[in-house]
A protein has these predicted regions:
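Short alpha-helix boundary/capping elements
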Residues: 49-56, 85-89
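Acidic, glycine/proline-rich low-complexity segments that act as flexible tails and inter-domain linkers
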Residues: 1-41, 52, 69, 93-105
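Aromatic side chains
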Residues: 27, 63, 86-87
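Extended intrinsically disordered, low-complexity coil regions enriched in Ser, Thr, Gly, Ala
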Residues: 56-78, 82, 92-104
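Short, structured motif recognition centered on aromatic/hydrophobic residues
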Residues: 41-50, 60, 80-81
Length: 105
């Protein structure tokens, strides 16, 4: 996985420790443990967790794109979010599916 610098780019001046943890720990360490869980599977977990939490903003779109980049197909993403709808709520899944439709267009 390519080095992530979004934390430093977006929040480095305002919240340097948060930016460091985002870039170096979350993306630098956790996401790089592919011997434990593949980046593809981490992407699926992340998209599902964000949807269930109601985080339906640019971060969800980023992670849907990330899932696509890690090999999750449009058909799989549709099924993942349809399945999640029954556990996280129909409106959240609806919003996530619309976002996924844009990403996979």
């Amino acid at each position: 996985m390519a080095k992530v610098t979004a934390g430093r780019d977006e929040l480095g001046q305002f919240a340097p420790k948060f930016a460091e943890l985002n870039d170096d720990v979350l993306f630098g360490e956790v996401w790089s443990r592919e011997d434990k869980l593949s980046a593809r599977d981490r992407s699926i977990v992340t998209v599902t967790a964000l949807t269930a939490s109601g985080i339906l903003d640019s971060s969800l779109k980023f992670h849907i794109q990330n899932a696509k980049n890690h090999g999750v197909t449009a058909e799989e993403m549709s099924e993942i979010l349809t399945h999640a709808a029954f556990y996280c709520g129909w409106p959240k899944a609806w919003a996530a599916l619309r976002m996924a439709k844009e990403v996979y267009a």
